[in-house]
Amino acid sequence: MSLEKVDRLVEQAKSIILESSNPDRTSLWRAYVALEYAILDLKLRHGLEGNPPPKPVKSADLVTAKSMIGRLNLSSSSDKKKLLYDLRLCRDIVKALVASKLR
């Protein structure tokens, strides 16, 4: 099975996070939703769950988010469980960024 939809969603989140020096709350929320949808698509299409999600991130900065999301590479990812874990970690970092914009 291909990962076209997941790839498209991850690229959407990457473009929001990587191309902006200071993304606003709405843009970060869009990136979060794209990552969440990619996670759901990957889980449902490939029947993945098994491993528990990573511990929630308490605080994050834009540099960490850019670093994590920049390392996502779906074309070389043959281990879908690792990809799911990485997507969840990126999602949690973006979620922490959205929360920090509320303060």
What does each of the following model-derived ranges do?
Residues 1, 46, 102-103:
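Short intrinsically disordered terminal tails
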Residues 17-64:
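Amphipathic alpha-helical interaction modules
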Residues 1-35, 87, 91-96:
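Short terminal alpha-helical segments
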Residues 5, 14, 43, 55-58, ...:
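Context-gated lysine
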Residues 63-103:
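Amphipathic alpha-helical binding modules
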